[in-house]
Amino acid sequence: MGNLVIGSRGSELALWQANHIKERLKKECLIESEIQIVKTKGDKILDTPLNKIGGKGLFTKELEELLLKGEIDLAVHSLKDVPVVFEKGLDLACITKRADVRDTFLSVKFPDLMSLPKGAKVGTTSLRRSMQLKMKRQDLDTESLRGNVQTRLKKLECGEFDAIILAEAGLCRLEIQGAKYRKAFSVEEMIPSMGQGALGVEMLKNHKHFATLQKLNDTESAFCCRLEREFIKGLNGGCQIPIGVHASLVGDRVKIQAVLGLPNGKEVITKEKQGDKTRAFDLVQELLEAFLQSGAKEILEKAQLF
């Protein structure tokens, strides 16, 4: 049999992730593989904010189509980009050990968020980040920032933005300092996106190597990420709407923190649940119920208008 074909987007970060899985497949599963670069809708449309492009799976749909046709064997995704409902026949074969889940502030001139001047221009791809920035600083001008990590950093260095927000995991994977000033927000300061920091490997469920890839699965990361995905699923949410959710395990206890609101930070719900690990999925349902009772659906409908 020939090598397995790994589908990946073409950015430096996406290829780092695909090569990471390629190396682990060889070392831990004794499987040889090769990488095929695939351009997704989200890669092709770079002059429009992600939430304006519309639809779910902006960075995954084309890869999923190739999986269904049998043209690639597996697709490596940033888990935060993976829709919570799969095309028929597809599923996650594994979720890798999480890297740093935090979001990071980067600036050439200003050491942290609170030192930015009034009206400072902050670049981010994410409505979730915009919302949480506005919760702290209504006076900031948050603007869409598209492109790969290096492109975004160049825009910062050229003075297009006073600061930008990126995922800490991506900076660490590419071994990039990023800017003179770099400061990660705590999870309490900025709740991450579902699955942030983890990779998801998607395959046909009936693929002969689907079960084999469990060797690459990290039990704790997968457990926490599945809780987060369950929360998003309950709100019928995706990665282009302003929702943050983070689950963490300490011993036998689980903590789930979530935030949801308008991108302008003016209507926001923030709640958390803690309890025994054995009740984890019940806690997600309780958290969902608390959000729905606080008007989550209505806020999300309003958020679509931004």
Q: Which functions belong to the PLM regions below?
A:
Residues M1-L46, K52, M135-F306:
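Small-molecule-sensing regulatory modules
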Residues E12-R24, G55-F59, V84, T104, ...:
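N-terminal winged-helix
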Residues T48-D73:
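Short, structured active-site "lid" loops
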Residues L79-V82, A169-L171:
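Short glycine-rich anion-binding loops that position phosphate/pyrophosphate groups of nucleotides
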Residues L66-L68, V82, E87:
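Extracytoplasmic loops/domains of multi-pass membrane proteins
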